[in-house]
Amino acid sequence: MATIKDVAKLAAVSTTTVSHVINKTRFVAEATQKRVWEAVEELNYAPSAVARSLKCNTTRTIGMLVTQSFNPFFAEVMHGVENYCYKQGYTLFMCNTEGDLEKQKHYLRMLAEKRVDGLLVMCSDLNEQLLTLLEKNTELPMVIMDWGPDSPRTDKIIDNSEEGGYLATKHLIENGHTHIACITGQADKVTCKERVRGFERAHIDANLTFNPEWILEGDFECASASRAVDKILAIEENKRPTALFCFNDIMALAAISKIQQSGLRVPEDISVIGYDNIELSAYFSPPLTTIHQPKRRVGKTAVEILLERIKDKDHERRVFEMQPEVVTRSSVSNRLK
């Protein structure tokens, strides 16, 4: 394996000059730079990250804990994170926890051993034990989605779930739907509680009552949505909901599929609105009306905030608040026409 001395010898310069060229820390004549880079390429030289981290007290690496990398919402957020890390010269260690506490502990320990400069936590499955582990890492710059711990040393991203739930339900009501069901995620999750509050507030503002039995608990996965739709379809036709609000797009798409398999039509018989605006939602049949969240922008902003915290651990706490909005497509019928 080539060393910096090998590069210096081939380029006929000092090791100090090679270091300045590679790290861009001092002006070096263009002709000299050319010789150095040609030597680097010929020898396939890679600077030692370990040596650099010891010298600069930084590894230029960021860790990321995520619930499920295959979930389209998290996948799009991760795309924004990875892309911006790359542009800023940082390497990303992505750790898929799958809700497993032992994996969470292992990854946190591994990231600490790797001496990452900062940590992004985008887990929807944070529990008290993991929160305790995170709170022990007081020296590690951290950005956490808003279901995480509230700490003056931790920057946060708030997804404004209550407003999103309100907008989704309000859109259905404005289209003449007064009998609305919803399929939530796990009832104990903060985001789900907030979206339910938004669902309820929209009914109150419209002077409508809602049926608590039509708030059906799912788990953000397809199978749970399918089971919930079975319960809705079991209701007598003239008494069943005319619209369904699903707490993420994956469940909404599964619900549409189940409704159509039963011989009913979306949106003519039952309207469906989702949440997240994942890329697939625009290409389903019918295209899904949903609540948009700026996922790639969230990823980019999370890294921006984290890099600020890495540079200045004492800077004022930052909170980035997402602004949900309705994206109207073809899965909601207008019953007022």
From Swiss-Prot:
Q: Which PROSITE patterns match?
A: HTH_LACI_1, HTH_LACI_2
User: Single Gene Ontology BP term?
Assistant: purine nucleotide biosynthetic process
- The answer to whether keyword Repressor applies is yes
Query: Which GO terms label this protein's molecular function in UniProt?
Result: DNA-binding transcription factor activity; transcription cis-regulatory region binding
The disulfide bonds in this chain are none
Question: What metabolic or biological pathway is this protein involved in?
Answer: Purine metabolism; purine nucleotide biosynthesis [regulation]
Instruction: Indicate the segments annotated as coiled coil, or none if absent.
Output: none
Ranges of residues in domain HTH lacI-type:
2-56
Does the entry feature the keyword Transmembrane helix, yes or no?
Answer: no
Q: Which Pfam families does the UniProt record give?
A: LacI, Peripla_BP_3
- Please list the residue ranges the record marks as binding DNA: 4-23, 48-56
Q: Which UniProt keywords apply?
A: DNA-binding, Purine biosynthesis, Repressor, Transcription, Transcription regulation
Q: Where does hypoxanthine bind?
A: F73, K189, T191, F220, D276
Q: What does this protein's UniProt record list under function? A: Is the main repressor of the genes involved in the de novo synthesis of purine nucleotides, regulating purB, purC, purEK, purF, purHD, purL, purMN and guaBA expression. PurR is allosterically activated to bind its cognate DNA by binding the purine corepressors, hypoxanthine or guanine, thereby effecting transcription repression.
Under the subunit heading, UniProt states:
Homodimer.
Domain statement:
Consists of two structural and functional domains: an N-terminal DNA-binding domain, approximately the first 60 residues, and a larger C-terminal domain, approximately 280 residues, which imparts the function of corepressor binding and oligomerization.
Name the UniProt record assigns to this protein: HTH-type transcriptional repressor PurR
Organism equals Aliivibrio fischeri (strain ATCC 700601 / ES114)
Q: What is the lineage of its organism?
A: Bacteria, Pseudomonadati, Pseudomonadota, Gammaproteobacteria, Vibrionales
Name of the encoding gene: purR
